[in-house]
């Protein structure tokens, strides 16, 4: 009986040695190292701090034009959003938001309303710069030029969709350097699945720290087969 036991133990040791030789991975337990994230990649319990940093600097932009059939009254032709870039009142928006405007109105989140001056625009990038004369200080968007957007980064789209009022949607950067969207214009878009709708154009796309990543520009309304795509928006 004792001999049989020794024989079984010996066989077990031999089999174990063969397995260790054939499969080195069994010699030790592999440990997984947790990936290191920077502060912009960490997932917070709430994005409210980022919203509070960025949202006050995102404004509503109204393109008003003369209606000759209504006794030349100014009426809202298109609407969009804009981003206050500095304390002097310079605002960036999309050119298509203010095209052919007879008057441009900017509404701040604190209730102040201003008539804006068009400083300049660029068809290639679909960007325009507005200027308002405001007293009492202006909120400005946080900017970090060292922060490079990466695929998978959490982003927030801030704007005024359908004139509902300021709205925040959340998603990730789905792609960078997207091309082929505008044959005559800029060919380097950020793609995101954060909801971007009519009225979001010119608004801010910010990271989880509230820092400006891009200017919301367009979304797919319909695909070539007539379907309405979801979760496909673009920012400059």
Per-segment meaning from a language model:
Residues 3-12, 16, 20-236:
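Serine-dependent protease modules
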């Amino acid at each position: 009986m004792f001999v049989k036991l020794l024989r079984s133990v010996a066989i077990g040791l031999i089999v174990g040695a063969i397995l260790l030789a054939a499969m080195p991975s069994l010699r030790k337990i592999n440990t997984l190292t947790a990936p290191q994230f920077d502060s912009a990649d960490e997932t917070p319990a709430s994005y409210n701090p980022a919203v509070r940093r960025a949202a006050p600097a995102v404004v509503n932009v109204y393109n008003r034009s003369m209606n000759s059939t209504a006794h030349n009254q100014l009426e809202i032709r298109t609407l969009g959003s804009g981003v206050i870039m500095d304390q002097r009142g310079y605002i960036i928006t999309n050119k298509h938001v203010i095209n052919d405007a007879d008057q441009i109105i900017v509404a701040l989140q604190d209730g102040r309303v201003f008539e804006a001056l068009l400083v300049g625009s660029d068809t290639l990038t679909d960007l325009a710069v507005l200027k308002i004369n405001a007293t009492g200080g202006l909120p400005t968007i946080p900017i970090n030029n060292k922060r490079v957007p990466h695929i998978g980064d959490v982003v927030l789209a801030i704007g005024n969709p359908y004139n509902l009022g300021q709205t925040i949607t959340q998603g990730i950067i789905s792609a960078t350097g997207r091309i082929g969207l505008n044959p005559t214009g800029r060919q380097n878009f950020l793609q995101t699945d954060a909801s971007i709708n009519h009225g979001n154009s010119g608004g801010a796309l910010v990271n989880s720290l509230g820092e400006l990543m891009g200017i919301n520009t367009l979304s797919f309304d319909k695909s070539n087969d007539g379907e309405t795509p979801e979760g496909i928006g673009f920012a400059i």
